[in-house]
Regions:
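Basic, Lys/Arg-enriched alpha-helical interface segments
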Residues: 1-63, 70-75
């Protein structure tokens, strides 16, 4: 699957690269799991509601979430 990043999400990802390698590793594990298992798997996948239908969230940790949408062959 091809990864497509929102500009703000990419900036957050780059920030985690320098600030907290543990969270960056968790984000990478979640992305790999999404590519393998779609909307099932680790991180307690939950569909979002209201204006975010079609989007899902997974827990990075107690405070942070990874928000994503799967379309065709893109995450």
């Amino acid at each position: 699957m091809k990864l497509v990043w929102d500009e703000n999400a990419w900036q957050d990802y780059l920030w985690w690269r320098t600030e907290n390698r543990k969270i960056l590793k968790r984000i990478n594990v979640l992305i790999q799991d999404i590519a393998r298992n779609g909307n099932d798997g680790i991180g307690k996948p939950e569909p979002l509601k209201h204006g975010f239908q079609g989007y899902w969230s997974r827990r990075i940790n107690d405070e942070h979430r990874l928000i994503y949408k799967i379309s065709d062959d893109q995450i």
